[in-house]
Structure formats: structure tokens, C-alpha cells
């Protein structure tokens, strides 16, 4: 299943127990950003550059959904291959989570460490923080600019910022990674030209596209046999059991 998913265009994975709660949220995101989804053909055929901004709530499910939305788009535009899609996914996901956790939710390194050691799930802490209206009303702004050569991204939260230099300096106590704290370095490893504003609540980075990359169909369907239908041929009837 994991290997099959590597080549798919999945926007979000929802467990059955959370289907009733999470599916409407994912569908709202897709509906809200349908213009972005339908820009693919226009972009590859007519437009050289597209840009925009996603406004996100402090919800980890949204992070996964928006990350897949962007990386799948670039993959389907033939701008990145599957390996680079995974690298970009890591960079975007880690920096968006940092914006929510440490920016809007003001979760300190020590607080996160204690929570992970005791309970093991940072998502529960984020949702606990969001019970406060002052936290819940904050937003993360995820901006993009996509050109044929590269994609540029900016992520800005409404928090107080942080001293980002200490987290990329290996000699700094906070630079020595322990139970967590890998996000900034991982993003810097996979993306290029990672830069912060002086306040530390905004990060920008670039991701170079593959040259002459061609992705005709999703990898998950590469081994599927092509089926050609004739005009007026009946493909299936209502109530018939699927063979897939």
C-alpha cells in the first residue's frame, strides 16, 4: 500500500474512524481552491507564471492536505518527478507545522519535548491550544509563485517569531537535535535559498524544477493495461460489482 501511494495523487488519507469529521473539512479545502486545481492545463498551455496564497487554520489535517495539493500539482505539470515531489513534501510539511506549532500555538521546545515524552502525539497538543480563541483565530498564510524553472514559497504565521539562527547553528544548544526539532534543517536540506525575516515568523524558499521531466500518468497506474472503449459501448451497469 505504501509503495502504491508513492505514485498516486492522493490529497489526504483519512481513517474510517475520523471519516465523518475529517472528510467534510478536506472537501471544503478542495472546493475553496478548485481554481488552483483547474489551473494545470492553463498553466502548461498558456500561462508561464501563476501565484496565489492559501489561508490556513491551525489544523494538522490542513497541513497534509495543502502540502499534497501543491506537490501533486507540480508533479502533474511535469515540473518535478516523484522523488522530488517527496522532497518538496517534506520541506513544505515541516515548515507549515512549525508555523502552527511554534508560531500560532506558541509551543516551546521544552513544552513539546515534555508532551511527546508523556503522551507522544503533538496533534493533541495543537488542538488543545486551539481551544483558546486567541490561538484559534490566528492563521497561516502559504503563498506560492510557480514558473517553468522553479517554484517559490513563503509561509507566514501570526506568532511572535523566534531566533531562527540558533536552530541552524550546529554549535548552538538548540542546534543539537534530540527528540524533535528536525523541521528547519530538513527543509534546508531539501529546498534551496531558505530565508527568514528578521522577526522569525516568515520563511521563504525555492524549489528548482526538473529539466525535461515528463510524467504522463501517475506512477500508481503505470502498470495498468490501457482499455479502449468503442462508441456506445456499455462499460458497466448500475448495481454491478466492480472488478477494481
Where are these regions (language model features)?
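Output/docking surface of receiver
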Residues: 1-38, 198
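Non-catalytic regulatory/interaction regions at protein termini and inter-domain linkers
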Residues: 1-11, 123-125, 147, 232
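CheY-like receiver
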Residues: 21, 34-62
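Conserved beta-strand-loop-beta-strand hairpin that lines the nucleotide-binding pocket
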Residues: 43-51, 100-228
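Helix-loop-beta hinge of the Bergerat
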Residues: 50-81, 156, 160, 164
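Conserved short strand/loop->alpha-helix "switch" segment adjacent to the catalytic nucleotide/phosphoryl-transfer site
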Residues: 71-93, 115-118, 174-178
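Conserved polar catalytic motif of the HATPase_c/GHKL fold
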Residues: 94, 98
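Regulatory nucleotide-sensing modules
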Residues: 227-244
Amino acid at each position: 500500500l505504501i509503495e502504491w501511494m508513492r505514485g498516486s495523487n492522493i490529497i489526504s488519507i483519512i481513517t474510517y474512524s475520523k471519516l465523518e469529521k475529517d472528510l467534510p473539512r478536506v472537501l471544503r479545502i478542495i472546493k475553496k481552491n478548485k481554481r488552483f486545481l483547474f489551473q494545470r492545463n492553463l498553466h502548461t498551455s498558456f500561462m508561464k507564471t501563476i501565484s496565489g496564497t492559501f489561508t490556513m487554520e491551525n489544523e494538522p489535517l490542513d497541513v497534509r492536505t495543502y502540502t499534497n495539493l501543491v506537490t501533486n500539482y507540480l508533479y502533474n505539470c511535469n515540473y518535478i518527478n516523484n522523488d522530488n515531489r517527496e522532497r518538496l513534501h517534506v520541506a513544505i510539511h515541516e515548515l507549515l507545522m512549525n508555523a502552527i506549532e511554534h508560531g500560532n500555538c506558541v509551543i516551546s521546545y521544552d513544552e513539546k519535548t515534555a508532551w511527546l515524552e508523556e503522551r507522544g502525539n503533538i496533534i493533541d497538543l495543537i488542538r488543545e491550544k486551539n481551544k483558546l480563541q486567541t490561538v484559534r483565530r490566528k492563521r497561516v498564510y502559504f503563498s506560492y509563485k510557480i514558473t517553468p524553472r522553479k517554484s517559490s514559497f513563503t509561509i507566514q504565521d501570526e506568532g511572535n517569531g523566534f531566533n531562527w539562527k540558533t536552530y541552524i547553528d550546529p554549535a548552538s544548544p538548540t542546534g543539537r537535535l534530540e527528540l524533535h526539532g528536525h523541521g528547519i534543517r530538513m527543509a534546508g536540506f531539501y529546498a534551496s535559498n531558505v530565508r527568514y525575516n528578521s522577526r522569525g515568523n516568515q520563511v521563504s524558499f525555492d524549489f528548482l524544477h526538473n529539466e525535461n521531466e515528463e510524467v504522463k500518468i501517475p506512477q500508481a497506474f503505470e502498470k495498468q493495461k490501457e482499455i479502449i472503449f468503442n462508441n456506445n459501448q456499455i462499460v458497466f451497469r448500475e448495481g454491478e460489482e466492480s472488478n477494481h
